[in-house]
């Protein structure tokens, strides 16, 4: 038995539909890889205060239960949060008028460069330096006065 030309056309159309459908599914773009932000999460200080770093801001939690979210309102309209990389020299240079603190920062930072998260809030700023996946060095500055604090991932 020989198939009619109409049957052959139907088979051809069906096979083309199946092939095109398979190609469309094969060419569907996969969702973009989500890059994990190594800073995001909860960090604890030696005094048991915690800092929550979110993708777009920082929340400071005091041991007494008070919390402050750094944002445009808390920073009187002068808020900036950014990620980047800084050299060891640039990080030590954040406290130019405090040579002892500058030396302490240099002693802690042994690599040439580090990932950083920087917060500018009103007249003060905070630079969080990722030492490894479990530790951050926080460099706080208010004008010319600086301080540092080690944080551990909670």
How would you describe each model-predicted region?
Residues 131-154:
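Edge beta-strand at a domain terminus
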Residues 23-26:
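C-terminal motif of bacterial Sec signal peptides marking the signal peptidase cleavage site
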Residues 37-42, 55-58, 110-118, 135-137:
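Short, hydrophobic/aromatic-rich segments at coil-to-beta transitions
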Residues 3, 45, 62, 121, ...:
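Acidic surface patches and DE-rich sequence motifs
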Residues 34, 38-73:
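Short, solvent-exposed loop/hinge segments that bridge or flank secondary-structure elements
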Residues 28-30:
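Bacterial signal peptide processing site
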Residues 4-16:
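Bacterial N-terminal signal peptides that target proteins for export
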Residues 49-50, 65-132:
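Contiguous, well-ordered beta-strand patches that form the walls/edges
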């Amino acid at each position: 038995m020989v198939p009619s030309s109409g049957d052959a056309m139907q088979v051809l159309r069906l096979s083309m539909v199946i092939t095109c459908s398979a190609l469309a599914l094969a060419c569907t773009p996969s969702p973009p890889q989500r890059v994990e932000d190594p800073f995001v999460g909860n960090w604890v200080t030696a005094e048991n205060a915690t800092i929550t770093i979110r993708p777009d801001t920082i929340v400071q939690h005091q041991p007494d239960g008070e919390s402050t979210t750094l944002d445009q309102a808390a920073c009187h309209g002068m808020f900036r949060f950014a990620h980047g990389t800084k050299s060891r020299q640039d990080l030590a240079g954040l406290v130019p008028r405090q040579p002892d603190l500058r030396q302490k920062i240099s002693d802690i930072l042994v690599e040439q460069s580090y990932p950083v998260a920087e917060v500018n809030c009103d007249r003060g700023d905070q630079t969080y330096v990722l030492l490894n996946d479990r530790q951050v060095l926080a460099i706080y500055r208010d004008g010319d006065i600086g301080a540092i604090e080690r944080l551990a991932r909670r």
